[in-house]
Amino acid sequence: MASEFSGQIQELLSRIPPVTRYILLGTAATTILTLCQLLSPSMLVLHYPLVVRQKQWYRLFTNYLYAGTGFDFIMNIYFFYQYSTYLENFVFARNAKKYIIYLVKVALLIDAFSLISGLGSALNQSLAAAIAYNWSLFNSFSKIQFLFGFHVQGKYLPYVLLGFSFLTGGLPSLVVLGFGIISAMIVNFFDSIHTPVVHRSNSPKLNSQKVSGTFIGKGKKLGT
């Protein structure tokens, strides 16, 4: 029984492209260590004095590995898996090097916005919003069933996420989520990432998807 379950897990992981897989595993491991009180979120999150004065540069990246706990964590992991898998497989054609470079650029821009504004210190949701924004560009005609059962086209997903973020977390939450979308726009412009027709979701394979509002969380301000 145990070996069969282990085999199913390995098969599931093997279907996930490498960059997405390792980010998901890193996020899951971080959450487990946090829940077991073996690791404090304050050791991971973005904090200006520690980054600049004490040169703890690792925080520029480790803050993305903390996605909260409970149901929010599960939903954030699910949506990151969905959208990042699509981007890595189809937009970046499973080119791990190019996808890593792209994510690093977006992450550093989000960090810069956060450090300048003083908003947000665990920015996993901002990165997920950036990925969701890119997914929406390539699936602009895909129908998405959002919370409470209303449907939106894929191209409106970023705006729906921003609106729901404002309703649940106020202006700070909206701004933190907006960091991700704006960062993706900037990187896309300079990297000349376009949306070829072949990837637009006229395809019947890209059917209605359900999106939960728990993807939006308040910008976490931890360890400060």
UniProtKB/Swiss-Prot annotation:
Key words of the record: Endoplasmic reticulum, Membrane, Transmembrane, Transmembrane helix
UniProt key word Cell inner membrane: no
BP terms from Gene Ontology: endoplasmic reticulum unfolded protein response; ERAD pathway
Membrane topology: Multi-pass membrane protein
InterPro entries: DER1 (IPR007599), Rhomboid-like_sf (IPR035952)
Subcellular location: Endoplasmic reticulum membrane
Any one cellular-component term (Gene Ontology): endoplasmic reticulum membrane
Gene Ontology molecular function, alphabetical: signal recognition particle binding
Transmembrane segments: 32-52, 60-80, 100-120, 130-150, 162-182
Name recorded for this polypeptide: Uncharacterized derlin-like protein C365.08c
Top-level taxonomy: Eukaryota, Fungi, Dikarya, Ascomycota, Taphrinomycotina
